[in-house]
Amino acid sequence: MYKFYNFFFILLTLLISACSSIPQNTSNSCSIFNERYLWYKHAKSTEKKWGTPIHVQLAIIKMESDFDWLAKPQRQKLFKVIPFKRPSSSFGYSQAVKGTWEQYKNETGNKLATRARFKDSV
């Protein structure tokens, strides 16, 4: 049983360390790309594919989610106190709603795309 707990703890530590955090300075694209080099590669490939400049991609993500991979709209309040449902199903870097994201996955053939992954959101 002790070995199981050790294995579980190590696995949990590895999973948590693999999670992406918000870049330190989201106002400076150079510092973002210094922290996350792969993000630059993904943004550059998106620029080649769609023609959208990198600074425009980053500006949209900054306004939509502020580079928070788990960003969701704030919950509405019931009687101004009780948290209620969210106004939309938008989520992740792109803040795409469920229907739009499903359409994107069907059109691109990328069934494993997630809204919380930067590569898929740009």
Regions found by a protein language model. Give the residues of each.
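Sec-dependent signal peptide recognition
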Residues: K3-L12
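Short linear sequence elements within intrinsically disordered, low-complexity coil regions
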Residues: L12-L14, G109
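C-terminal motif of bacterial Sec signal peptides marking the signal peptidase cleavage site
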Residues: S17-A18
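Catalytic glycan-binding domains that act on GlcNAc-containing polysaccharides
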Residues: S21-V122
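Intrinsic disorder/low-complexity signature
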Residues: Y2-K3, R117
